[in-house]
Amino acid sequence: MNVIELQRALRQLRCSGMAAGLEPRLLEAQTDKLAPLDFLATLVQDELQRRQDRLLERRIKQAGFRDRGKTLDTFDFDFNKKMNRRLVFELATGRFVTQHEDGLFLGPPGTGKSHLAQALGFAVIQQGHRVLYREAHVLLDELADAQLGGTRKDYLAHVTTVPLLIVD
């Protein structure tokens, strides 16, 4: 079996990460004189990383964030001096999600509540949890549409079973 046939077989097995990394990893194995087991381990790591990346991307898309650029790295804590930085980073650990606790941001418009909500949602996704982000009016519209369409129970099941529901 040659490289092209092996790549095709790997894709059939749904191992696209291994297929994509096969040629460069073969060169690396020859150059670094990798043992067969080390070579295989590297290919498997490529596949695992690709799957993890795709899962993360899928969960971010499914979350429905309004602005994907809102992360804790992009939040300006100097803008709002009253923001408890330590508490925000504690929330970013996601412990409140695993402990089934609620969180609530209160404050006037323009103080960073939406940014922080999305940033914390992103951090929680990176820890392996599912997140659903909806603006309040969108959530109510979707619920009304589900009611009219006779799918209210399904919609409520979808919304209430996600580990973190963010209503902005």
Listing of model-derived features with the role each one plays in the protein:
Residues Q7, C15-R68:
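Interdomain "pre-motor" coupling segment immediately N-terminal to P-loop NTPase/helicase cores
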Residues A9, K61-N84:
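Dynamic helix-loop-helix/coil hinge segments at AAA+ ATPase domain boundaries and subdomain interfaces
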Residues H158-D168:
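Conserved P-loop NTPase "ATPase switch" module shared by AAA+ and STAND
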